[in-house]
Regions:
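Mid-to-C-terminal secondary-structure elements
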Residues: 6, 20-46, 53-175, 248, ...
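Membrane-helix entry/capping segments
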Residues: 15, 50, 133-183, 201-204, ...
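Conserved G/P- and acidic residue-centered "switch" motifs that form tight phosphate/ATP-binding loops
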Residues: 39, 60, 90, 191, ...
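Alpha-helical transmembrane segments of integral membrane proteins
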Residues: 162-167, 196-222, 226, 246-372, ...
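Hydrophobic alpha-helical transmembrane segments of multi-pass inner-membrane transport and secretion
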Residues: 170-205, 285, 316-344, 589-625, ...
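Intracellular coupling helices
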Residues: 188-232, 296-310, 610-651, 708-716
Length: 718
């Protein structure tokens, strides 16, 4: 299947509406295997070989709802796009959102070497990717003989599945979060085991009576496991309810374009079955050990001690201690990981950008086919737009860029320096801008001068370099006056017209400060800025700095565009630059990790405190008689407090030590799976201090109760 994408505009209304159009070969419907909701899809007769395509259009579901109010009588109506009428022949279902398009039009494939297509493929059943790669590589080699400039010798085919394309970007993060969920599950199950063991130990007399009356060990185990499973099922039901409510929130936190538009992320039947099965399995697994331990009571000892409060015994205390230590260790690991993720995200938030995104926005304006086909006409159109927008009272300044809107600027290309050899593999980023661009983004000039408006409009062969390039190639500060050449600056009309001789030598007239040009984390690359008339594009951005919140000015900006050309639309998705930054893959991904890890860590901390509180409360209850005897013999409250804290000190201390070792051992994995995360010793020490404080707080209330015991009451305690 072949496809192309373009931005069109409706021309049957007062104000033009931006429409994202995907042109498809007529086999698209069968290729994707998705039948239309209404009418039909594209068919071969819509784009006959050697002829212009038929004026038919298939609507996306969202455009059908937005533009036609989901009217089922839409078939046969006419939609005018850029003054051309198209007959509506179909509407696609909600799940089909290929290209996030509004409309689908028949595509006419051409042999024009300037046209490029990225056709999605569907492999035949039984054909491996390796076999398909080999077959396609042979085909590419044949193409290279006809158009060698499009297919250099190093060109290789590497098929990638659609799911792989998305999993590649987010897969490591999902595995990391799955690991965090697993840790939280183990911590929760450990907590349940502690509670079951404590409750079961308190029931040893009851269980011994049952055994003495003939209850077999298997029956006692079944009873205890049933109680454990009741907790698991109740917890699973509550968890599923919370998941149904929380999944939409988590999807909102996901980085934009993390999944295909067609992906339906919801709690479906497989997820439900997995959750219930996991709940039952953990209920059996973590309830089995306490059940087996409690199903072998010492009948003689227990019955003889029936008039006294039962104690857990050495083995029971050891199991309690191990469970508490494991819970503390895993909680420390999760808290340390969360601290590292949060620190990495905070560092990313405070990354020096080199430009000021506050109160600035980018307004994208697509040029229609067969309009402004020369560089003079196109530059005059955009300069008129820029001047009108800059004159608005809410606007501080406005500039033009065809490919340099932060946070990802420019395109990489080979270059030459006059009198200085440059390795073939070296590249720089080329940015096409107007002189006002630097004023709008507050990028300072460090040396020399900017090119001015007159030089831009006549296509003067001038260039500015960033600080990184100046230091790399002219470390002594001699960049001004040097000459540089970018061979690919040559125009390709009518889509990319350019000023005459744009691919000739350019003179460097200034050095500007570095600005991040490849996302938020990648180091700044060598870059040049040239007048945007050196190579015009079909999509151009007007960068606007405002005195107020930028999006409140958007209506006025649209009115200015309409005043210059009533048929010209503004692209639908307009954001201020701060919003563009927060939709970047690394920003949204680290935010997701930090938020979820933080939430999991807080839950783990609460579970650990609850588990430790339960253990200490149980110990105090079991040793009430002992504490009464000690106090009757003269022991003070401080002595009793010390005994209570000492009863858990070994378990907590061992858990902290194990958690520190685990955290430091696994910090490399965290850094690899969550880029930017930093779990250094300071974070681990802070978490240790936090857990020590939490453990102390968990022990305070039971310890206070123990130290406040009336010796006479304690001696009578059963």
């Amino acid at each position: 299947m072949g496809e192309d994408e373009w931005n069109l505009t409706t021309t049957d209304e007062d104000l033009p509406e931006d429409v994202t159009a995907v042109y498809m070969t007529p086999n698209a419907t069968t290729h994707f295997g998705v039948p239309p909701l209404l009418g039909r899809g594209l068919i071969p007769s819509d784009a006959p070989d050697g002829q212009d395509p038929q004026p038919v259009v298939v609507l996306s579901h969202k455009f059908w709802q937005r533009h036609y109010g989901a009217n089922s009588d839409v078939l046969g109506r006419t939609l005018r796009l850029v003054h051309k009428s198209y007959a509506i022949v179909g509407v696609m279902p909600p799940r089909f959102t290929w290209g996030d398009a509004d409309v689908y039009l028949p595509l006419k494939l051409t042999q024009d070497p300037k046209m490029q297509y990225a056709p999605p493929l569907r492999l035949k059943a039984g054909v491996s990717r390796a076999a398909a790669n080999a077959e396609l590589q042979a085909l590419i080699q044949q193409f290279a003989k006809d158009t060698p400039s499009h297919f250099p010798p190093s060109f290789r085919v590497a098929l990638q599945g659609l799911n792989d394309h998305f999993v590649e970007r987010l897969g490591a993060t999902l595995f990391l979060l799955f690991g965090a969920v697993g840790l939280l599950l183990v911590i929760g199950c450990t907590n349940v085991s502690i509670l079951l063991l404590a409750r079961g130990t308190a029931r040893r007399h009851e269980l011994a009576v049952r055994a003495a009356m003939g209850a077999g060990r298997s029956r006692i185990v079944r009873q205890l496991l049933t109680e454990s499973l009741e907790l698991s099922v109740a917890g699973a039901a509550l968890g599923v309810l919370l998941a149904y409510q929380g999944v939409s929130l988590i999807v909102k936190w996901l980085p934009e374009n993390s999944f295909p538009h067609e992906a339906a992320i919801s709690i479906n039947l497989p997820v439900l079955v997995f959750s219930v099965a996991l709940a039952l399995a953990t209920g059996v697994l973590f309830g089995l050990s306490p059940a087996l331990h409690l199903s072998r009571p010492d009948l003689a000892g227990i019955m003889q001690a029936s008039t006294r409060r039962m104690t857990a015994g050495v083995r029971g205390k050891r199991i309690h201690g191990i469970l508490v230590a494991a819970q503390v260790a895993l909680t420390l690991l999760l808290l340390s990981s969360a601290g590292g993720a949060i620190r990495g995200f905070v560092r990313l938030m405070h990354t020096s950008l080199g430009y000021d995104p506050h109160n600035a926005m980018s307004v994208a304006i697509p040029v229609h086919d067969n309009t402004y086909m020369t560089w003079e006409a196109r530059s005059q159109f955009f300069e008129q737009l820029r001047a009108r927008i800059a004159a608005m009272p809410e606007v501080v300044s406005a500039g033009i860029s065809t490919n340099a809107t932060p946070p990802s600027n420019g395109w990489n290309t080979h270059f030459e320096i006059l009198g200085k050899p440059v390795p073939q593999e070296r590249e720089l980023r080329t940015n096409f801008v107007s002189p006002e661009y630097f004023t709008v983004l507050h990028i300072p000039l460090l040396q020399g001068r900017l090119f001015d408006h007159a030089e831009t409009m006549r296509g003067a062969r001038l260039a500015l370099v960033n600080q990184t390039m100046a230091h790399q190639y002219w470390p002594l500060g001699e960049a001004i006056g040097q000459q540089i050449r970018v061979p690919k600056l040559k125009g390709e009309p009518p889509y990319s017209p350019a000023a005459p001789d744009s691919d000739a030598w350019l003179q460097i007239v200034g050095v500007v400060a570095d600005a991040r040009d490849d996302g938020l984390r990648e180091p700044v690359k060598p870059a040049i800025y040239v007048p945007y008339t050196m190579k015009m594009q079909m999509f151009t951005q007007i960068l606007v700095r405002t005195r107020v919140e930028p999006l409140t000015v958007l209506r006025g900006v649209r009115a200015q565009v309409h005043a210059v050309n009533p048929d010209q639309q503004v692209m639908g998705r307009v954001r201020n630059l701060e919003q563009w930054i927060t939709t970047q893959q690394e920003w949204a991904q680290e935010r997701l990790v930090a938020l979820l890890f933080g939430a999991f860590a807080v839950l783990a901390l609460l579970l650990s405190v609850l588990g430790l509180y339960s253990v200490v409360s149980y110990i105090v209850a079991q040793r009430t008689n002992e504490f009464g005897i000690r106090m009757a013999l003269g022991a003070g409250r401080t002595h009793v407090l010390r005994l209570v804290f000492a009863s858990t000190a070994l378990s907590v201390g061992g858990g902290l030590a194990a958690g520190v070792v685990l955290s430091l051992a696994l910090k490399g994995m965290l850094a690899r799976w969550a880029e930017g995360s930093s779990m250094d010793p300071a974070i681990v020490l802070a978490v240790v201090a936090l857990l020590m404080g939490a453990a102390t707080a968990a022990c305070v209330l039971p310890a206070y109760r123990a130290s406040s015991i009336d010796p006479v009451t304690a001696l009578r305690y059963e």
